[in-house]
Amino acid sequence: MQLNLGAIFLALLGVMATATSVLAEPHRHQGPIFDTRPSPFNPNQPRPGPIY
């Protein structure tokens, strides 16, 4: 019985670790990421503003 409880505890610990890493992942990238490199495959190029 002790071994079974240990296995359950380890499985629960692994699930908790993966859940926290998955939940914490989207908070690293906040706001839109604008790529400033000129490229024909780049959908997020900043628009050239008016020259003052």
UniProtKB/Swiss-Prot annotation:
Superkingdom to which the source organism belongs: Eukaryota
Disordered: region residues: 28-52
Pfam families attached to this UniProt entry: Antimicrobial10
Propeptide: 25-26
Subcellular location field: Secreted
Signal peptide segment: 1-24
Major subcellular site: secreted
InterPro entries, sorted: Mtk
Tissues expressing the protein: Hemolymph (at protein level). Highest expression in fat body.
Inducers of expression: By bacterial infection (at protein level). Up-regulated in hemolymph 6 hours after immune challenge, levels of expression increase for first 24 hours and persist for the following two weeks (at protein level).
GO biological process, any: response to bacterium
Keywords: Antibiotic, Antimicrobial, Fungicide, Immunity, Innate immunity, Secreted, Signal
Protein's job: Potent antifungal and antibacterial activity against Gram-positive bacteria.
The protein's name in its UniProt record: Metchnikowin
